[in-house]
Amino acid sequence: MQPPELEIGMPKRHREHIRKNLNILVEWTNYERLAMECVQQGILTVQMLRNTQDLNGKPFNMDEKDVRVEQHRRLLLKITQRGPTAYNLLINALRNINCLDAAVLLESVDESDSRPPFISLNERRTSRKSADIVDTPSPEASEGPCVSKLRNEPLGALTPYVGVVDGPEVKKSKKIHGGDSAILGTYKMQSRFNRGVLLMVNIMDYPDQNRRRIGAEKDSKSLIHLFQELNFTIFPYGNVNQDQFFKLLTMVTSSSYVQNTECFVMVLMTHGNSVEGKEKVEFCDGSVVDMQKIKDHFQTAKCPYLVNKPKVLMFPFCRGDEYDLGHPKNQGNLMEPVYTAQEEKWPDTQTEGIPSPSTNVPSLADTLVCYANTPGYVTHRDLDTGSWYIQKFCQVMADHAHDTDLEDILKKTSEAVGNKRTKKGSMQTGAYDNLGFNKKLYFNPGFFNE
């Protein structure tokens, strides 16, 4: 009698059970939540997930729903190639995201004694029949793709966002740009999987509930969609306090993601102000810190993984409490009537400021610091569509990043923002500081050499 053949990888009965029930599993599971949980559990790497999402041109002949179904199927089939423990890890992942029917379906192929002798904390909380579960919205449904943290809650493992956020088409490059910049040179931007890292922090809530940044969730979605199209690895966070923010900043910039990346972008969206000439940043617990402390983190000694790499820091919040009302264009002709804005035609807006009550600036290389306004002035955010600056930046990037370098993108963004007005005629002007950013940065969306 021949001994049973030794199986390598996932047992055959498990592989066949997934394949046999593939359509049911797609129907019974949420793709975005399952994809994120598989990365967090270590079933798949971010690169593996991206490979399953790349349909090699098929989307041109498929509608959006069919594309998502195909990506869902490829995700599950990829798991069948992930070793002998992947099946039980998948069951655990399904329980963690409350897809209990799918978990029970996978469990049905085995005898009870073949299940792993452990159970996760999430499984203990949710291991009930589906009929007993109340269909409550997921955290993502209520607060968007950003991860918020309680006051003393640990940050946890660094996990890239892998959900899909819809948005306008981002035009794709037809080449890697740089040949026309022989004098200045260009930053290297050609990797498929290490093109860039985005750390996005969007603080919306504060101790005073009346100061909630209404509409700011639109900015998170716009930025995530844009940088997904640029092939960046994205870490989105929401309400964090000052201590959590700096721990997060250290954790991200010392990670292998940043070590291997070609470019780093940080966007911090919150309330800000200028106090005695120093620009301040506010966190969700009401604590305030000098903006310079955040910039200092990117010095060479503190951030060795980003030496000689382009660093883009975006601070789209108030830098004071003054309203920029501009000056009339008709100063040379006093008889020409001055235009007055009609209030009913303008959307409701909020400013991004802290209510009002130097040391030497360290040198930073290869760094662009981007602001939504000039020093001393407030910024504006539409309650329905998001902040003026972020929305215009995303729009200009989508239209021009395929053939335009970042500094020209910022100039075009500033021009577009400068054309907007509030009900009372207030405006704002974007600005940026070039700190040794001595080459051109092209994002080259959709084109890869590596």
Swiss-Prot record:
Location of region: Required for binding Diap1: 114-125
Keywords: Apoptosis, Cytoplasm, Hydrolase, Protease, Thiol protease, Ubl conjugation, Zymogen
Entry's induction text: By ecdysone; exposure of salivary glands and midgut isolated from second instar larvae results in a massive increase in levels.
GO MF entry, a single one: protein homodimerization activity
GO annotations of cellular component type: apoptosome; cytoplasm; nucleus; plasma membrane
Regulation of its activity: Zymogen activated by autocatalytic cleavage; association with the Dark apoptosome brings multiple molecules together to facilitate their dimerization and activation by autocatalytic cleavage.
Outcome of mutating residue 318 to G: Fails to induce apoptosis
Name used for this protein in its record: Caspase Dronc
Phylogenetic placement of the source organism: Eukaryota, Metazoa, Ecdysozoa, Arthropoda, Hexapoda
